[in-house]
Design a protein with these regions (language model features):
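Conserved, mostly hydrophobic/aromatic
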Residues: 1, 115
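N-terminal glycine-rich phosphate/adenylate-binding segment common to multiple enzyme folds
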Residues: 2-10
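Catalytic beta/alpha-barrel core
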Residues: 10, 29-38
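Charged helix-capping and loop-helix junction motifs
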Residues: 14-20
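Short, well-ordered coil/turn segments that N-cap beta-strands
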Residues: 30-32, 51, 109-111
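C-terminal domain-boundary segment and adjacent tail
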Residues: 32, 124-144
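Active-site rim beta-loop-alpha module in soluble metabolic enzymes
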Residues: 39-97
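Flexible, glycine/charged-enriched surface loops at secondary-structure junctions
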Residues: 96-107, 137-144
Length: 144
């Protein structure tokens, strides 16, 4: 289960919203997996509710020093080249870190990777990232 848009972003920062979502998912089916932003309140709420949680990272977004997504209102919020997207994804997968917009290395767990489908570079990013992951002998698996 993945909340979308503003709800996803609010749950990442607000433990009350994250808890409400986690409890609702648990009530429907405790075996469901909750997806949410890595390093967020969503993960804490899922753990407290006893749900499986997948830490989602973004190939097409930059990160703050706090490990959160750079707000879209910032000029440097989006990644716009295949090379940047590939480098970021490989760093998150292989090293468990991401480099913030200020150059700091932030710990991050990558269980699933998001590429915004409405992004200008979505198809290209997906194709190139998939190719590099496979060429790097990184196994893509379903955890379900």
């Amino acid at each position: 289960v993945k909340p979308h848009g503003a709800l996803y972003n609010k749950a990442a920062k607000d433990i009350n919203i994250a808890t409400t979502i986690a409890e609702a998912v648990k009530e429907v089916d405790a075996s469901l997996i909750l997806f949410g932003l890595a390093n967020s309140e969503s993960g804490k709420a899922a753990e407290k509710a006893g749900l499986n949680f997948y830490n989602e990272v973004f190939a097409d977004r930059t990160y703050t020093d706090e490990g959160q997504l750079t707000p879209r209102s910032e000029y440097n919020a989006m990644i716009n080249t295949n090379e940047e997207a590939i480098d970021q994804v490989l760093q998150m997968i292989s090293k468990g870190t991401v480099t913030s917009t200020n150059g700091h290395t932030i710990p991050i767990q990558a269980d699933t990777i998001c590429i915004h489908g409405d992004g200008e570079h979505a198809v290209s990013f997906a194709q190139h990232i998939n190719s590099i992951i496979l060429a790097s002998n990184i196994q893509i698996v379903s955890k379900a």
